């Protein structure tokens, strides 16, 4: 038992090490976002203030700051400005995501759409994106503008691809990976690559950080999707079975559908063909997930992407920042919050 606690402490320390290494700048990122979102429309003010108060770990912004530091960008405020851009893209996509999913809880708090409705959530999400693009233009770097605008388009396409395959029980792993690479990993990748651009690094180093971010993002999404069948609301701010009730076909269901017996497969097909799934449907699914040890298999798949993320950093010289980013790969899959 002691060794498990030590592992969890070590994993969570990887996140804290990252946070501590950029803590002074994260405060400035939050201030930048707050100032940029000021509006004379009272509802916009209320909704953006609530979004800031209930914000998450700011991990993507931290990755931009950390990657910039790794690549020698130490003076000037461009890293702060672009980390804020990355965070705004993320916040906007979450607002839109919650509308699509009819989400009511995120990070243990009520979602914006559950308080103010879908119409206002979509419009304020658009407002966040428009402010983000203003900041990108202010930065003035065409490469950054191309990268982040292309990333925004990729995220949207990933969401549409997921909608296209919603409730399709025979979705293959290749399609699943394409979805999460677009809707999640693309922003992780861009957040890291921005740091290499700011540091004026060559294409090899830019692509190395891009690859690191992409594989880290894939790992994070696999972890999130797996937690949906093995989660704790107090720790993770999400209720178990959310994806199941929404009819999303994620890695645990894909692997389960491949390995379970024909009768069980027929039951899964029936569940996902219905407009709504019940608590008993979820209980049956959780039982056979446990029966075939699906959670362990999902984490094993994620290990492959952890390895790819870590090895992407080998091209960089030894440094404290490199170690912090390498250690973060374990946090992505084994985190306890």
Enumerate the predicted regions with their spans.
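All-alpha prenyltransferase/terpene-synthase fold signal
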Residues: 1-337
């Amino acid at each position: 038992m002691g060794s498990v606690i030590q592992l969890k402490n070590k994993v969570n320390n990887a996140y804290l090490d990252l946070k501590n290494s950029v803590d002074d700048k994260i405060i400035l990122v939050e201030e930048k976002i707050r100032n940029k979102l000021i509006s004379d429309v009272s509802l916009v003010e209320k909704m953006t203030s609530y979004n800031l108060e209930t914000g998450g770990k700011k991990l993507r912004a931290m990755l931009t700051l950390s990657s910039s530091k790794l690549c020698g960008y130490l003076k000037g405020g461009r890293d702060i400005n672009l980390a804020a851009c990355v965070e705004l893209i993320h916040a906007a996509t979450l607002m839109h995501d919650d509308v699509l999913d009819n989400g009511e809880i995120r990070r243990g708090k009520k979602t914006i759409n559950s308080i103010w409705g879908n119409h206002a959530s979509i419009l304020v999400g658009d407002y966040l994106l428009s402010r983000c693009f203003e900041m990108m233009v202010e930065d003035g770097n065409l490469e950054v503008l191309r990268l982040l605008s292309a990333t925004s388009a990729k995220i949207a396409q990933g969401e549409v691809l997921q909608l296209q395959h919603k409730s399709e029980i025979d979705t293959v792993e290749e399609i699943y990976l394409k979805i999460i690479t677009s809707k999640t990993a693309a922003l992780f990748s861009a957040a890291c690559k921005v740091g290499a651009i700011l540091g004026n690094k060559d294409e090899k180093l830019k692509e190395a950080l891009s690859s690191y971010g992409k594989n880290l993002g894939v790992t994070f999404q696999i972890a999130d999707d797996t937690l949906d069948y093995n989660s704790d609301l107090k720790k993770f701010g999400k209720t178990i079975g959310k994806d199941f009730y929404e009819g999303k076909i994620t890695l645990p269901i894909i692997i389960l559908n491949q390995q379970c017996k024909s009768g069980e497969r027929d039951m899964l097909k029936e569940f996902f063909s219905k407009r709504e799934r019940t608590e008993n449907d979820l209980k049956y699914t959780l039982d056979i997930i446990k029966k075939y040890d699906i959670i362990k298999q999902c984490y094993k798949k994620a290990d492959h992407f952890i390895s790819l993320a870590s090895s992407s950093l080998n091209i960089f010289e030894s440094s404290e920042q490199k170690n912090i980013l390498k250690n973060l790969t374990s946090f992505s899959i084994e985190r306890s919050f």
